[in-house]
């Protein structure tokens, strides 16, 4: 069972990783998915894809620089999300659920390690 999806769908302190750049990027991803839920336009999807790619790259560089042991697992999770965005079928509920659970399970594993 996953974590509850916030309503309204906004970042809150329970998602804090304690790396300001990552927390700020997570806020941007929440915002992007929120907007996509209200307007499933190609422009909103493209903006979410752009922000997601930038965030994943930044996170992966931090993990590589610190030789984080969970790097490969983390990249696989990122690749799966990107694949879903690149083959988008309008499932905003899935995207909301993925981000919440990714942060609170996968991202929380690197707290204090990168």
UniProtKB/Swiss-Prot annotation:
Q: Which UniProt keywords apply?
A: Iron, Metal-binding, Oxygen transport, Transport
Q: Gene3D superfamilies given for it? A: Hemerythrin-like
Where do the annotations place Fe cation 1 binding?
Answer: 26, 55, 59, 107
Is Membrane set as a keyword in this record? no
Molecular-function annotations in GO: iron ion binding; oxygen carrier activity
Q: Which Pfam families match?
A: Hemerythrin (PF01814)
Q: Which domain of life is it from?
A: Eukaryota
User: Which residues are recorded as binding Fe cation 2?
Assistant: 59, 74, 78, 102, 107
Q: Does the keyword Metal-binding apply?
A: yes
> Which family does the record assign?
Belongs to the hemerythrin family.
Main role? Hemerythrin is a respiratory protein in blood cells of certain marine worms. The oxygen-binding site in each chain contains two iron atoms.
Q: What is this protein called?
A: Hemerythrin subunit 2
Q: Please tell me the species this chain comes from.
A: Golfingia vulgaris
């Amino acid at each position: 069972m996953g974590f509850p999806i916030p309503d309204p769908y906004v970042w809150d302190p329970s998602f804090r990783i304690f790396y300001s750049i990552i927390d700020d990027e997570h806020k941007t991803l929440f915002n992007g998915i929120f907007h996509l839920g209200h307007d499933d336009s190609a422009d909103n999807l493209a903006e979410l894809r752009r922000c997601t790619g930038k965030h994943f790259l930044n996170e992966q560089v931090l993990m590589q620089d610190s030789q984080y042991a969970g790097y490969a697992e983390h990249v696989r999770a990122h690749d799966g999300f990107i694949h879903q965005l690149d083959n988008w079928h309008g499932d905003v509920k899935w995207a909301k659920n993925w981000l919440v659970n990714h942060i609170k399970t996968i991202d929380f594993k690197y707290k204090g390690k990168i």
